[in-house]
Amino acid sequence: RPADGLLKTIAEKASQPAFAGIGMGSDSLYLVPFAHNTLLDGYNGHLPWLQSAPDPLSTVTWQTWVEISDATAEQLGVKEGDILRIESSKDSIRAVAYPSPAVPPNTISIPFGQGRKHGSEYATDRNGSESSNVMDILETTTVSGTGSLAWAGTRVRVTKTGESISISKLEGNVRAEEIGILPAEDIIKTIAPENA
């Protein structure tokens, strides 16, 4: 089969990813930056109506947030709204914590798009706790053989600053809750089809 040769060749060229930044110690985390839904890579940061458009998953607006797994947040003693310092060997930024059940353990995610240094007042001159640029801490690690920038090739250290603010978001609680925990939910049990 011709495909066997191609797949074998691809598999032989595979390698483990190379990471740069903070060492592989127990206190370092993987940084996975992602494109902001409306601000993109910051191109639209000067438009206030796009700054105020909520992210479709977190519903955060106007701020740089760091998504952190619930388990990692608990381990670090991080609560929603805590201002975190995210440090790579290149630089550090500050962002507001957003614990999420969707983030893998030992990983943080930060959107591109905020923290611009040039542009309109909507894109610049904002508090570093609310508007930081993840590009400032990305290492310039490249993918072997292609020369492409390894976007998720940076390890970072996260520490609490001792400050906390409210996250500018539209959602309430994203956690799944068992029905029947609150006394007011008992009515749901009484009107269930099997009880009718």
Predicted regions mapped to residue ranges:
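A cross-kingdom feature strongest in bacterial/archaeal respiratory oxidoreductases
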Residues: 1-196
